[in-house]
Swiss-Prot record:
The keyword Phosphoprotein applies. The active site is at H187. The keyword Phosphoprotein applies. One of its GO terms (molecular function) is hydroxyphenylpyruvate reductase activity. This is Malate dehydrogenase, cytoplasmic. It holds the Pfam family Ldh_1_N. It comes from Felis catus (Cat). It catalyses: (S)-malate + NAD(+) = oxaloacetate + NADH + H(+); (2R)-2-hydroxy-3-(4-hydroxyphenyl)propanoate + NAD(+) = 3-(4-hydroxyphenyl)pyruvate + NADH + H(+); (S)-2-hydroxyglutarate + NAD(+) = 2-oxoglutarate + NADH + H(+). It is an enzyme of class 1 (oxidoreductase). Signal peptide: none annotated.
Length: 334
């Protein structure tokens, strides 16, 4: 058995964490021979609920779970971390402007970035899930200057999985038969789900999704809006936001960081845009197609970008630049 790794989940008393913690504890994310010390952080009023989650994790009797620590203190939570999964954020309330949401979360992620800087290992991998995820991730990254920027990523894998699922449903295949969809940009309704480089396995052969579907108007219209608005559709139907699917996407994202991506496949994640080959301005936290090897991501190069894609990619970059500007105004005045 290897040495235990310390994994933090914030917002640990919440819905997404409840669907996520078992998968981390049972070896589905870091492997079946990797012991884990699981650290659960939430705000003080949630500590009663968190105690219940702690009891349940103990009652799972998971052999890989060497210890579970529930806390509301950042110095305890962020100490010596190998992985930080930042799920907790201020949720959007009725009548709340996106700007107000940004303001509340900038404060949270500035503090958490500073705590990572102060207490965590410099090699820590940080995954931001709490919305607005891209800008929250950028804020945390800026607040932890001695941790490499490349160690920060935000979750767009849920959008990626949603796009795969829509294509699979349309073609009557399983999601596993679809690969190399791309989510460009922000984890918001401006994101651009792009299947112009995606492949699907049909009758034992790999074909391009556009060739397989022969329905350009659906792919350039309804498909994109369905993926963009899927989160809202789940809330409308379930009266709660996506939790099971979000937790599964977090597992996929973190597992790929840990073990790498399969040969010939790429995945989507929000990463720092510096030096990217697709004309996205530097210093944004933007979702790109990446391959991962030795726990290090690399943006997939050489993909042709048509005018349709260019326009959509620029639109979501513009939104991210505006979010960043708003967030950093708050940061400098905080």
């Amino acid at each position: 058995m290897s040495e235990p790794i310390r994994v933090l989940v914030t917002g640990a008393a919440g819905q997404i964490a409840y669907s996520l913690l078992y998968s981390i504890g049972n070896g589905s994310v870091f492997g079946k021979d990797q012991p884990i010390i699981l650290v659960l952080l939430d705000i003080t009023p949630m500590m009663g609920v968190l105690d219940g989650v702690l009891m349940e994790l103990q009652d799972c009797a998971l052999p890989l779970l060497k210890d579970v620590i529930a806390t509301d203190k950042e110095d305890v939570a962020f100490k010596d971390l190998d992985v930080a999964i930042l799920v907790g954020s201020m949720p959007r309330r009725d009548g709340m402007e996106r700007k107000d949401l940004l303001k509340a979360n900038v404060k949270i992620f500035k503090c958490q970035g500073a705590a990572l800087e102060k207490y965590a290992k410099k090699s820590v991998k940080v995954i931001v899930v709490g919305n607005p995820a891209n800008t929250n991730c950028l804020t945390a990254c800026k607040s932890a200057p001695s941790i490499p920027k490349e160690n920060f990523s935000c979750l767009t894998r849920l959008d990626h999985n949603r796009a795969k699922a829509q294509i699979a449903l349309k073609l009557g295949v399983t999601s596993d038969d679809v690969k190399n969809v791309i989510i460009w940009g922000n984890h918001s309704s401006t994101q651009y789900p792009d299947v112009s480089h995606a492949k699907v396995k049909l009758h034992g052969k790999e074909v391009g999704v556009y060739d397989a579907l022969k329905d350009d108007s659906w792919l350039k219209g309804e498909f994109i809006t369905t993926v963009q608005q899927r989160g809202a559709a789940v809330i409308k139907a379930r009266k709660l936001s996506s939790a099971m699917s979000a937790a599964k996407a977090i597992c996929d994202h973190v597992r790929d960081i840990w073990f790498g991506t399969p040969e010939g496949e790429f995945v989507s994640m929000g990463i720092i845009s510096d030096g990217n080959p697709y004309g996205v301005p530097d210093d944004l936290l933007y979702s790109f197609p990446v391959t991962i090897k030795n726990k290090t991501w690399k943006v997939v190069e050489g993909l042709t970008i048509n005018d349709f894609s260019r326009e959509k990619m620029d639109l979501t970059a513009k939104e991210l630049a505006e979010e960043k500007e708003t967030a950093f105004e708050f940061l400098s005045s905080a």
